Amino acid sequence: MVSLKDSHFELFHLPAQFALDEPTLDAAYRAVQSQVHPDRFAAAGDAQKRVAMQWATRANEAYQTLRDPLKRATYLLHLRGVDVGAENNTAMEPAFLMQQMEWRERIEDAAAAKNVGELDALLDELRDERRARLAKLGSLLDSGSDQGAAEAVRQLMFVERVSAEIGAQIERLEH
């Protein structure tokens, strides 16, 4: 029997690992939701309705976490007792810091020139960067290199933040 305190992976009867088969996750989520959806308990007492709502909320939270690779990696590291430290650990490899500065310059230059094409190209580049970094993150997690994985998570958070900023710049320039 699964309890509310079990891990997201245990809730869906999945192995606690980074590599996840999304259709299997989706099917496991639907199976749990079909058992705990509040509509199934419409005629039940208040206590049962509350418990069903807790389970449905828990299933949604677990699903959203496991569905997103970055959230899944952060959660997996948390289960292993590793704090990603995104709020207070900004130490990064010098090469990545240089890459950040280059991206920022390109964003500023393209925005100043109102060059949506350059921003789109940079966004494509960052999507490729994200894919490559997710693959590296998976390898680090699978090999048990948790500190390296924590740094990779922080770097990916930055890549996602910059991608969102570029998207916002494109939106502003197109309207």
UniProtKB/Swiss-Prot annotation:
Q: What keywords does the record list, in alphabetical order?
A: Chaperone
Task: Report any one BP term from Gene Ontology.
Answer: protein folding
Q: Which InterPro entries match?
A: DnaJ_domain, HscB, HscB_C_sf, HscB_oligo_C, J_dom_sf
Q: Does the keyword NAD apply?
A: no
Q: Which cellular components does GO assign to this protein? A: iron-sulfur cluster transfer complex
Which SMART domains does this entry report, sorted A to Z? DnaJ
Q: Does the keyword Metal-binding apply?
A: no
| Matching PANTHER family | IRON-SULFUR CLUSTER CO-CHAPERONE PROTEIN HSCB
Q: How does it assemble?
A: Interacts with HscA and stimulates its ATPase activity.
Summarizing the function annotation, the protein's role is: Co-chaperone involved in the maturation of iron-sulfur cluster-containing proteins. Seems to help targeting proteins to be folded toward HscA.
- Identify its protein family: Belongs to the HscB family.
Name of protein: Co-chaperone protein HscB homolog
Can you name the source organism? Burkholderia thailandensis (strain ATCC 700388 / DSM 13276 / CCUG 48851 / CIP 106301 / E264)
